[in-house]
Amino acid sequence: MAKINRRTLLQSGVALAGASMFGGIVRRSQAATAGLTLYNGQHRATTEALVAAFTKATGIDVTLRNAESPELAAQIAEEGDRSPADLFFSEQSPPIASLQEKGLLGQIDPATLKLIPAKFSAKDGTWLGATVRTRVVTYNKKMISPADMPKSIMEFGTTALAGKFGFVKQDGFQEQVMSIVHIKGRDAALGWLKGLRQYGRSYNGNRIASTAVENGEIAMALSNNYYWYSLAKEKGAENLNSALYSFPGDDAGNIFNVSAAGMLKSSRNQAAAQRFLAFMLSKEGQEAMIATTAEYPVLAGLTSPYNLPSLANFTAPVSPADMGSASDAYALEREAGLI
């Protein structure tokens, strides 16, 4: 996903304003008939497929602003009630939870929230999980056997695995830290982070880390499941040097990460925004998203085209709703010298 800074976002806002003069984008005062503005941090192809399906089904146009989820959350917080956004779709739950904590999100229709398990949505009903991915360990089958894999996330960052593992400080990492905080405590999480810094190898992206494992550059890496499944669909799982591993039991390393969406309290087109959120959890909306990425649907009864194993076989002791904005995770990373 292309990185867009605040200046780029502001410049795109100017461009949007100019487009409104020529009928390309209708002004905010006409939002009730003009459609929706969605700030999007989720994978662009996924959201574009969802929006296309929604517009086809409803006739409601949706204008996208694409950037990294934390940047968009900060932008919305800065804009406050003046934000042109009606909706925010975040690749992870912490950025949208930060808006929840600031009181900037509106209530989602309870009938919509009832469509999916409560563990995938905010406890106060202000955001919902749209797709799910799991935290896993990607390992090279030629460099380590499943029997020799660590039995707990806490073994990473110890001398026993020095130089053998990689990690990525984004896209699921903060949730990983918060899970350890919830299960093991703050001191244990800080010690774990210091161990990662001392004994692990940092990669600038989960895809890069997964590729490094596949190519034999390193034995294993903490990652999200969908990078490996995308590669497996492309090349065939039987042809890969790497495989996925999950920790046994209720280990703190087992996490559900969700892409999450919510409606801004300041939206002037809330009826259409509620309709969009409901569509996200419909069969049509879910199928549009999971066709583009190896993430799980949150709606029961659907099958991913990426041949994902059942989520029933994966146990996570901490729910996405319990992760919060992950501000504690960032503080711990700074204290450990990782950022």
Annotated model-derived regions:
Residues 94-98, 220-240:
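A ligand-binding cleft/hinge motif common to bilobed small-molecule-binding domains
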Residues 8-28:
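N-terminal export signals
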Residues 133, 161-168, 193-196, 201-203, 238-265, 279-302:
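Periplasmic-binding protein-like
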Residues 41-61:
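Short, polar/charged alpha-helical segment
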Residues 32-42, 61-65, 164:
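Short, well-ordered beta-strand elements
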Residues 41, 45-48, 71, 83-218, ...:
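Extracytoplasmic ligand-binding site segments that recognize negatively charged/polar headgroups
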Residues 138-143, 181-182, 256-269, 288:
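A bilobed periplasmic-binding-protein/Venus flytrap-type ligand-binding module shared by bacterial periplasmic
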